[in-house]
């Protein structure tokens, strides 16, 4: 089933009552998902909240609980979501949300007291309060704590006319969490060229939160020992913000972007094993900002003995030719056996640059561009009056180690942000500043 068909099926639930409550089945799911978003839950939990009751309608032949929905709807729903291609972490939570109810019926007298008449009746059909052995098994489940959170949203999602995102808000999120979120044609392009442009990976509505978090980081003061702000000095003595690094722990929105299951699954697919975040940066390229010289990333990523990286660029603002969008060399895929002529600063030589056809990759806000560490790339100056902000997150093979903290510790020592620099000390950028216009 396509995501469009799933959304249409959910939309039809607007006329199906949620028994014993003043909401429809659709409204109940939307409210549960909205509560998950407000709680800062991971995307797979948000989708589990949206879809936790699909088992009530996905199998017309299911046994019924005397007008109270399908018997075993949690298992039916989990099987259905797995069958239509959603990632297993979603179906696992959906399959556990009735166990959470049965657990709370034993361990929380107040919870049991507040159950509606309909919920009390369905509890009987669902096996009643857990036995001691069932309690132990459920507590040992890897989804135990998340299932309890899901249950709390389930119980609270019964308000008349509550504020919450509408159904369309979840379209892009659902696509991201499909096992086939990348098509065979896209994988073929990746394998042939080492890069991939995925349009509309995040919706305009979703990008509101990302843009707000980026605005917040942009306005934050320079603080030693925390987020790392780097500047460029162009034709005047005025410093212009060029880049921020090491910000994952300071903006929760970026936690899901960089380490949530959807993007880790995508990066793992492209890297051919589990991916681990190596480093993150925001390139701002404000109006008048300088370009980035042509280079490959691989020569700059040798510090920790890793052999292969993939970078995910999320376009926060639109990227155009006028504001200096990313440009990629159109060439068959390169690897460590392909030697390109470089300058001493590890940028590509004029001869190497002239040997490629450079393709501007214009992007809309919410698009991804992914490229491996051997893809030659560059960008031009921003000659427009609008910014071209973009998130760049680089990943390595998890088997080669988790080096994010060590990377930023070494960079802070060798090439610190302005606020941490000592007067009279000459900082050589080396591998920490290849091809970019950050001031020395």
Question: Whereabouts are the PLM-identified features?
Answer:
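Short, conserved beta-strand element in jelly-roll/cupin
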Residues: 303-321, 362, 370, 394-399
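Non-heme Fe(II)/2-oxoglutarate
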Residues: 217-220, 226, 368, 375-440
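Double-stranded beta-helix
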Residues: 319-380, 400
